[in-house]
Amino acid sequence: MNWYEKLSEYFPIEEMKSKAHMEALLKERSDIYHKDEGKHHILMFAEFDSFIFVDYLYVSKDARGQGLGGKLIAKLKKKNKPILLEVEPVDEDDTDTEKRLRFYQREHFKHAQSIGYRRRSLATNEVNKMEILYWSPKTESEEEILEAMKQTYENIHTYKDEKWYGESYEKTDEVLEIIDEEKQKNIFDQLS
């Protein structure tokens, strides 16, 4: 099974980019978009001047629980930049959602509670609510995290989207926003 098939098998369709989109990022945006692949893992990430965005982190079933994911995150942390990623809310029908969240909690990621993130999947046409997690070597404001996510959305997620999907994703300001304080909830509180 190739790297794309492994990612497609593990991640929900609404979170997956097309293979052509990812290959174009690797080829045409090799200055920022990278693939770290080994026998038991795939790490897709974008490294910008001031932050890193983890697009996909996959560890094979037989290697989970052996510290490989932590080693991959530690390698990124050594770059001494904030690390951002997206996670889906806990789904009781999918135990992996809670396991992923626990992993990032162990790795000292914080939830950007003030950032609302909803984007329509061009594969399913459904709107998906995602949460933003981040780790930083210094104190970052959630406004700075929001600006980094906007940069990611515009340079990675929507890169040549019409070419790959036949239509465009929504505009950045329709997808990412600061939400009212009374609506903010810490996703880590969902863990049992």
Curated annotation (Swiss-Prot):
Keywords: Acyltransferase, Cytoplasm, Transferase. It comes from Bacillus subtilis (strain 168). It holds the Pfam family Acetyltransf_7. Coiled coil: none annotated. Disruption phenotype: Cells lacking this gene display decreased survival rates during salt stress conditions. CDD domains: NAT_SF (cd04301). The lineage of its organism: Bacteria, Bacillati, Bacillota, Bacilli, Bacillales. PROSITE patterns: GNAT. Induction: By different stresses, such as ethanol, salt, and phosphate starvation, in a partially sigma-B dependent manner. Transcribed under partial control of SigM ECF sigma factor. It comes from the Bacteria. This is Putative acetyltransferase YjbC. InterPro entries: Acyl_CoA_acyltransferase (IPR016181), GNAT_dom (IPR000182). One of its GO terms (cellular component) is cytoplasm. It is an enzyme of class 2 (transferase). The keyword Transferase applies. The gene is yjbC. Its EC number is 2.3.1.-. Residues 1-139 form the N-acetyltransferase domain. Its main location: cytoplasm. It is found in: Cytoplasm. GO terms for molecular function: acyltransferase activity, transferring groups other than amino-acyl groups.
